Every structure is written in structure tokens, then in C-alpha cells.
């Protein structure tokens, strides 16, 4: 299942190579800091055990990796993967004291790992940016161990008309904020458009099931502004 907007040549990589050094700041501004609680909810839902391996795909600057290591122990390991070289470099420097986090430049559709390597797979605000949802989910299933769990935290469809009205109007301001902070509004015009075009909660559940995940479920956060999906490789 290809995504038309994301298949525009070099669009997504150019977006994140432009904003990497202001990525954390913009996340805080755009969500009023709420993205931190969404990510903590993901880790809480995961309830990770010690000495396990996580792959964090479309890792950004490594927020999920840091939360995972802090919630487990020093023998847990995280492989952070992102298609943006600049984002990987920035995240690696940001978390340089975390010796059990490794970093690779790669895309969700083609992960540089052998089959059945990880206990947990996370993609946080990244599935929407992939060129091909089907390939991304197939790769997620491939690299998970049997009994491993998949998590996707992503912008979704709001289930309240009033909240949706407020959000749609607020989203019009995001490119202006991006221009003020980053000096370029185009990456944030892409952000807003990609959110509008992304599939809804039930469609993602159906796609997960198509690619062999079982016990698939989701919870809406903040009225569906964001949804947390999960499934198992059994």
C-alpha cells in the first residue's frame, strides 16, 4: 500500500534533514509538550521487561529509546533507525551517554537486520512518513521474534466534532510556527497534509492483521489526535 505524497522524490528525507536541529523544540511547541506524555503512555502500555531488545524505527532524536532504557536496565538494547542521516547524527550525540543504544540510517521498508531479532518494535510518528505501509509492516513482522510486540504511535482521526474543528484550525498555524522557528514553513505544510491523508484507526488495524499481526488493538489519546496501535507476532 503506497502513499502518494510520500513517494514524491526526496520529499520526506529533505523535510527531516531541514528540521533535525529544531526537531525536539518544534515537537514541544506544536504539541504544547503533550508528545512526552504520549510516548510515556507507549512505554507504559509496553511494560517492557529487562534484558530485551527494542528496535525504534523512524526514531528521530531517540526519545523512545531513552524512555525504554530508563524503564529497564543496562543490559537492555535499542537499535535506533531513521532515514535521515542528520537526525541520526543529532540523536546519537544527544544520547551519547547511553552505550546500549546503536544507530543506523535505514528506512522502515528495508531494515538492515536478520529475521526474528527484536522483542519490541516501535514506530512513533513515523509510519505516516513511509512510502509503503505494506512493506513497512511486513518488515516489522519479519524482524520481531515470535512472541514479540509491535507498537505504532501516530496522528489519527479525531472522534469528537468540536475537538476536530479546533484541531483543524490550529493545524493551519503550524506552518507559520515552523517558518518562525526553523525558517521554512514547507516541512510543516507537509506535516499537516500527511496527517490529513493518513489512514484511520480501523484501517490500520485491518492492515496490521493482513500482515500477520494478531491480538491487534488501539487506544485513542486526547480524543484521537493520536492513536496507539499494538499487535503481536505469535
Per-region residue spans from a language model:
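Conserved alpha-helix/loop element of class I SAM-dependent methyltransferases that forms part
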Residues: 32-52, 67
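Core SAM-dependent methyltransferase catalytic element
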Residues: 205, 211-234
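A short acidic, Gly/Pro-enriched loop at the edge of an enzyme's catalytic core
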Residues: 109-121
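A short glycine-rich, Lys/Arg-flanked "PGG" loop and its adjoining helix->strand segment in the class I
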Residues: 134-149
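Hydrophobic beta-strand segment of the Class I
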Residues: 23, 121-122
Amino acid at each position: 500500500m503506497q502513499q502518494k505524497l510520500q513517494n514524491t522524490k526526496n520529499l520526506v528525507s529533505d523535510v527531516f534533514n531541514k528540521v533535525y536541529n529544531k526537531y525536539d523544540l518544534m515537537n514541544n511547541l506544536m504539541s504544547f509538550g503533550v508528545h512526552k506524555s504520549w510516548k510515556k503512555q507507549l512505554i507504559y502500555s509496553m511494560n517492557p521487561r529487562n534484558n530485551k531488545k527494542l528496535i525504534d524505527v523512524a526514531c528521530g532524536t531517540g526519545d523512545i529509546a531513552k524512555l525504554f532504557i530508563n524503564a529497564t536496565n543496562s543490559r537492555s538494547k535499542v537499535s535506533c533507525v531513521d532515514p535521515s542521516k542528520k537526525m541520526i547524527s543529532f540523536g546519537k550525540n544527544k544520547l551519547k551517554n547511553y552505550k546500549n543504544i546503536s544507530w543506523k540510517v535505514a528506512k522502515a521498508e528495508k531494515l538492515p537486520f536478520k529475521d526474528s531479532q527484536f522483542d519490541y518494535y516501535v514506530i512513533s510518528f513515523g509510519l505516516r512518513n513511509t512510502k509503503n505501509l505494506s512493506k513497512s509492516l511486513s518488515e516489522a513482522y519479519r524482524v520481531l521474534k515470535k512472541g514479540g510486540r509491535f507498537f505504532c504511535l501516530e496522528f489519527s482521526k479525531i472522534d469528537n466534532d468540536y475537538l476536530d474543528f479546533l484541531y483543524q484550525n490550529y493545524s493551519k498555524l503550524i506552518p507559520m510556527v515552523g517558518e518562525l522557528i526553523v525558517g521554512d514553513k514547507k516541512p510543516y505544510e507537509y506535516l499537516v497534509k500527511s496527517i490529513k491523508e493518513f489512514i484511520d484507526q480501523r484501517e490500520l488495524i485491518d492492515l496490521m492483521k493482513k500482515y500477520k499481526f494478531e491480538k491487534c488493538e488501539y487506544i485513542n489519546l486526547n480524543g484521537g489526535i493520536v492513536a496507539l496501535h499494538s499487535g503481536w507476532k505469535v
